[in-house]
Amino acid sequence: MRKSKRERQRLLQETIRENPFVTDEELAEKFSVSVQTIRLDRLELSIPELRERIKHVARQSFADKVRALPLEEVIGDIIDIEPDASAISIFDVKEEHVFRRTRIARGHHLFAQANSLAVAVIHDELALTAKATIRFVRQVKAGERVVAKAKVTGKTKSGRTVVDVNSYVGQELVFSGTFEMYRSNMEKKDGDSNEYRD
Amino acid sequence: MRKSKRERQRLLQETIRENPFVTDEELAEKFSVSVQTIRLDRLELSIPELRERIKHVARQSFADKVRALPLEEVIGDIIDIEPDASAISIFDVKEEHVFRRTRIARGHHLFAQANSLAVAVIHDELALTAKATIRFVRQVKAGERVVAKAKVTGKTKSGRTVVDVNSYVGQELVFSGTFEMYRSNMEKKDGDSNEYRD
DNA sequence: TTACTTTTAGTACCTAGTCATAAAATCGGA
DNA sequence: TCCGATTTTATGACTAGGTACTAAAAGTAA
């Protein structure tokens, strides 16, 4: 059955959002209307043509790619970094990061921000978290901006680097953690458990 | 001065690699040759036309984005649960969960699996992680299946529930953590057959 | 000059559209 | 059921950024 205009336009938006590479012709076939109708729909919904959509997606990703490679894998945006000393990142808590019912941020996102910052601050080819002690000091809600501050504080006797990370919303401490990081270029060679290299 | 054919084609490749959004016309102007010459060059160098280049960039980034979205939600599948006692979940480590270079799983995914299992095992309206001590025992690689086992081990004097989570690949322990969970209804033991907190 | 490479020009055709106009089909209400 | 409005479809002219092909002009080396 052919849907109503409203319903078709709703589905059209959804379809294009899911697959921006779809042509008007394909959409026309999908909704059993003429190509002209699809074009009228796009006009009414202010959806740009295929090529413009593709260009937009490409431009975005190209801009992203220009960002430094190691920083790309960090959760949150690094705004300051002094290798092997300190680093700061910000992470905006959005709806997708919180429990639906309570709107409180899920712990692993705060952990991910802190952990990836601890990885980033270490100026080495390979950095992995060996151990961590973390404390969720207060709940973070959607809409809040979390500023994580990492500081390299020392080394364990086994040669691991210790990084302290404190995360704040405004002046308020919301998360704190101590990370023991394993790194590849340790001056002291220790018979650590099975490390994996490729 | 107009460069030799060889030199022009070398620069052409470089230019397009740096900016795939450049048209033949712009290139012709840049190298002071005709558009036809540029097209001949692309033909000889097997460089696709502008639209194909853009499409390629867009397709790549789109695939990445589709993979990145569920990354935020996937924290393992619960395969067994005994409320307020124990729970088991599995998590398949895929390419999107690992560091590209080393193919070692990023710590926050293992944490997320364990943490969300600790949340799930607590049979209450609200469960939040207050504190956690975790240990990454051995590195997990892409393709491996991580089985997390949570066990409620007791309570702190402040009334928090303590959950121990151990994660395995096969028989081998890869992650272990102790989670101190805050919960809303601490004394109440209602038979509320609630939904899973996502 | 001849022979060859390189460059330029021009044509027809393509896709996936744009914009504008007009006709046909469908729908809701009295 | 007819009327007017909305919605859909058709048509034509035009666009960018090409492909594919043919042909001629310009440059170069012997």
Swiss-Prot record, chains A, B:
CDD domains: hot_dog. It comes from the Bacteria. The keyword Phosphoprotein does not apply. HAMAP family: Transcrip_fact_FapR (MF_01814). Transcriptional factor involved in regulation of membrane lipid biosynthesis by repressing genes involved in fatty acid and phospholipid metabolism. Belongs to the FapR family. This is Transcription factor FapR. It comes from Geobacillus thermodenitrificans (strain NG80-2).
